[in-house]
Amino acid sequence: MNSNTVHFINILKKDLSESQIVSTGSFEVKDPRDRLLNKSEICIKPKNTKEVSKILRLAYKLMIPIIPVGGSTGLVGGQIANETDQVILSLEKLNEIKFYKKSNLLKVQSGAILSSIKNLALNHGRLFPLTLASEGSCQIGGNLATNAGGLNVIKYGNVRDLCLGLEAVLPNGKIFSSMKSLKALISPIAILAL
């Protein structure tokens, strides 16, 4: 671990709990086919968008490579990088799911497991139609990143067709949001497809 990375971690320790910054041992992230491997000495586990923003803002300033890692079910190696002294940003604690009965909407964080989303919808008498073989371990952030289709794609569309808004943290730490009320969703620009 280089001195810049040590400085990065020391600054983050002021804002995050010890359980959110794991720097003991070596973390390995493999693709499901065991062809690619990503190694890092540090894994950070933010719980909300503001923490992700702080982490990325500081990493951008100090030029620390960040590798976001979700369920690691993707087959194209998106969770693998070639950098040294990279930091893994685990999305596992970004798993909150809320159902809004009045507007008939789900709001989910990027680390939410697809089967958990489907179960919550079912508990409220609704259907979240994305159906994948990996739904017990894949995360919705990865589904959106790859525009997953699944078994019901012909009837309901890809996952981006099911998404009405998006909140994302840019590499410089700025937060982008297209989260609006249902009335404001009529837009000529398909911002989610960009």
Regions found by a protein language model. Give the residues of each.
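Glycine-rich beta-strand-to-loop/alpha-helix junction loops that act as flexible
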Residues: V69-T73
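Conserved strand-loop elements at the edges of beta-sheets that form or border functional pockets
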Residues: P46, P68, S110
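FAD-binding subdomain of flavoenzyme oxidoreductases
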Residues: E96-Y100, N104-S110, L114-L194
